[in-house]
Amino acid sequence: MEKENRGITLIALVITIIILLILAGISISALTNQGLFKNAKTAQKETEKAEAEQGQRLNEYEDEINKYLENEDENTKAFKEKVGKVLSTTDNTELKDAKNNKIVVPAGFKIINGATTVDKGIVIEDVTETATKGSQFVWIPVGTITKADGTSTTITLGRYDFNSTTGKESTYSGSFVEEDSNDSSTLKKYGNTIAKSITNFKNSVVQNGGYYIGRYEARTATARSAKDNALTQITEKGTENVYNYVTQLQAAELSQNMYTIDKFTSDLMNSYAWDTAIVFIQKCGTNNKYSRQNSLNTALLQTGTNSLTDTSKIDVQCNIYDMASNIEEWTTETSSFSSNPCVDRGGYYNRSGIYTSSRYPSLTSDSYDGIGFRPLLYL
C-alpha cells in the first residue's frame, strides 16, 4: 500500500498555518484590548514584540528546513560519489541511494550514471570479468522503499497472477511449480533444468533487500541463425545480438555458468524473480498494467527494442528492456505437463495474444528465433 511521506511540503504548510495564527492573534489583541486608539502605544509595543518572536520562530523553522535540505543533498551527493567507480573487486558493497534505500553492489561491478533512487532502476555494470565485461543488470528492490517523489511503496517477493483488467497482482493459483533442490517434495524430474537453489535465492533477497536481473534479453557477440549453432559466451550488453535459438537446458547452463565466483550467484530467471520484477515495474514504472503488455515490435530485433529510433516502440520500464517485447524468455519454472515441462515467459514479436506475465509450457527440445532468456544475480 502506498502512502505519502512527510516532507518539505508538509513543513511549509505547518509554517504557513503558524504564521497565520500568529498574525491573527496580533490583530485580535490589538483590536480588543480596551480600544484601539486608547491603547495604541501598548498595541504597538505588543506588535513589535510579536513580530520579533515571529521572526525568531521563522528563523528556527528556516534552520530546520535547511537541515532537511542539506541531509537530502548529502544523501544524493554521497550516492553520486560512488557512481562510476569499482567499489571493490573482492567484496560486495552495501550502499544507500538518494532516498536511503539499500543497494548491494557485487564485487567487480560499478553503478552507472542515471538513476539515483531504486524506483528508477539502478543499473550496475561488470567492469572486471574479461568474458562478460560491460554486462549490465538492474536492481529489483524488495520490501518497503522510498521513491524519488518521496512516497513509499512495498514490493513483496512472490509468484503472482495478474488481473486481466487492472493488472493487480494476487498470489499465484496455478499448477506450475518452482522446484527447490533443497525440498525433495517439490521435485518433478520432468527433464527441464531447475534453479540452483530457490531457498538460497529467497534467503538472499530477504537478507539483501533485492536481487538483480539482466537489463536486456541475454546477448552474445555472434548472431545466431539456427538451433544447432554452437553455444557462445553470454553477455548483458545492449549492443550485442539477442541469444535466441536456445533450449531451456542450454539457457540454464549458460546463465548458471555466467559467473562462478563465490561472492554472488548467477542463474536463469525463476518465477519469483520474474513476477516480482513485474510488481516492481507496475509500482515504480510508467505502466501499471505492464503485466498485460504485449510486444511493441512485430518483427525480430537482433539487438532488442533498445536499438530503435522510434521511441514509441521501445519497451523499457525502470531501465529494464523487453520483458514484454521481442522474444519469449526461458525460466526455471516447471509446468504441470511432464511432456512439456519447460516454462517461457513474456511477450513475443510474432504473437499479439501473449504478454509479460504469460506462462507457456514447452518442450525441452524447443529452440527457435523467438525464444531466448535472461540471467539473474543474487548475493
Show the residue positions of the predicted features.
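Aliphatic-rich helix starts adjacent to a transmembrane/signal segment
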Residues: 30-54
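Short, solvent-exposed loop/turn elements at domain surfaces
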Residues: 146-155, 220-225, 352-355
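N-terminal single-pass transmembrane signal-anchor helix
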Residues: 6-31
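Short, glycine/small-hydrophobic-rich surface segments
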Residues: 60-83, 288-301
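GGW-centered surface loops in extracellular recognition modules
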Residues: 75-149, 266
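Acidic glycine-/aspartate-rich tracts in secreted/extracellular proteins
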Residues: 28, 143-146, 217-220, 332-338, ...
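C-terminal, surface-exposed recognition/capping segments
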Residues: 272-275, 303-379
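Short aromatic-cysteine micro-motif
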Residues: 126-134, 164-322, 379
